[in-house]
């Protein structure tokens, strides 16, 4: 567990109305998504999602007016430190801007979660660089989960050497704050499958949740989505349904992931899934390219595809308020 105090793409393919592997057509996918920028404010209450597009200074989540005792945290994702390519020639610069944006929110987050692909090539130097950069975040705690780019060639050992203190197994863990139970999962170690949890981790989740009352709000972090967003590209977790079954009894469950480099929301009963954008480079919309490769957009539009996420919760309210903001 990392918790330290240092403080546009080609035309859609012509099967847009055919169901995909997970039962959603590509047109249905688009209805769930907020592609390439635009701050999307989402309120999760009673298993329903209400959303609208908002500017960075939208009044629904004013930074300085949090209710007393509220939990406020930030999700950042997919910084890909070490990436070199035309999709973003300065990922260090854009990640630095994201850190400055977090520090300029007008409040001190209770914690910051980086939901994976901290690095691009899993080198010791890249892990050290991103760790040093995140010490500049004005927060008491920073948590992480690994992405597949953090697990290249060594099943995540170098990642765990830098960010794995206090974790269990291959890097999973849980914690509680402000009446919310958080679970951080690792689903990036089987690169031939991409999204995979494994029996040991699923058993951990079973034991971890067993003693919790069903009215406990639960937030689950992972890198790859825990729902079948687009299995053809590895945007799914093959054994996630076993964890989802354990979460069904809770009245409010929110799953936050990275990996897909774009905003996406899906609700299934009491569980809402939110995919985050990136601080590095955009990926194509599902079905609009042969593969999920970095997309080159005009330089002036790049920041519209990058961003951060803030989440607010007040104890006693069965809701989370989620706001996605493009880089300023």
Where are these regions (language model features)?
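N-terminal active-site segment of His-dependent metallophosphoesterases
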Residues: 17-18, 48, 52-128, 207
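Surface-exposed cleft-lining segments at the edges of enzyme active sites
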Residues: 83-85, 118-119, 188-197, 227-232
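Short, well-ordered beta-to-alpha junction loops that form the rim of enzyme active sites
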Residues: 187, 221-226, 258-260, 325
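N-terminal secretory signal peptides
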Residues: 1-28
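Active-site neighborhood of phospho(di)ester-bond hydrolases with catalytic His/Asp-centered motifs
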Residues: 76-77, 112-116, 143-148, 221-222, ...
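Extended active-site neighborhood of metal-dependent phosphoesterases/phosphodiesterases
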Residues: 59, 65, 123-217, 239-254, ...
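N-terminal export leaders
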Residues: 24-50
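Short acidic, glycine-rich surface-loop motifs adjacent to enzyme active sites
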Residues: 213-229
């Amino acid at each position: 567990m990392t918790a330290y105090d240092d403080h546009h793409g080609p035309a859609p393919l012509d099967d847009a109305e055919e169901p995909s592997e997970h039962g959603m057509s590509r047109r249905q996918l688009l209805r769930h998504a907020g592609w390439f920028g635009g701050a999307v404010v989402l309120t999760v209450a009673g298993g329903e999602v209400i959303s609208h597009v908002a500017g960075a200074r939208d009044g629904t989540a004013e930074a300085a007016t949090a209710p007393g005792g509220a939990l406020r945290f930030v999700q950042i994702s997919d910084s890909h430190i070490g990436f070199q390519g035309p999709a973003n020639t300065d990922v260090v610069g854009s990640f630095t801007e994201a850190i400055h944006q977090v520090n300029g929110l007008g409040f001190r987050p209770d914690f910051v979660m980086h939901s994976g692909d901290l690095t691009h090539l899993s080198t010791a130097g890249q892990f050290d660089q991103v760790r040093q950069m995140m010490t500049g975040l004005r927060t008491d705690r920073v948590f992480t989960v690994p992405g597949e780019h953090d697990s290249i060639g060594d099943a995540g050992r170098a990642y765990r050497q830098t960010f794995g203190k206090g974790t269990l197994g291959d890097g999973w863990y849980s914690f509680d704050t402000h009446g919310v139970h958080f679970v951080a999962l690792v689903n990036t170690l089987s690169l031939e499958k991409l999204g995979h949890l494994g029996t040991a981790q699923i058993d951990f989740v079973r034991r971890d949740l067993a003693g919790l009352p069903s009215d406990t709000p639960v937030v689950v972090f992972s890198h790859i989505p825990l729902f079948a967003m687009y299995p053809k590209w590895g945007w799914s977790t093959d054994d996630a349904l076993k964890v989802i079954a354990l979460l069904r009894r809770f009245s409010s469950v929110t799953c936050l992931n990275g990996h897909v480099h774009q905003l996406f929301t899906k609700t299934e009963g009491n569980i809402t899934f939110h995919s985050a954008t990136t601080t590095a480079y955009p990926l194509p919309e599902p079905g609009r390219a042969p593969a999920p490769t970095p997309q080159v957009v005009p330089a002036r539009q790049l920041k519209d595809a990058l961003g951060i996420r803030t989440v607010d919760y007040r104890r006693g309210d069965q809701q989370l308020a989620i706001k996605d903001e493009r880089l300023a």
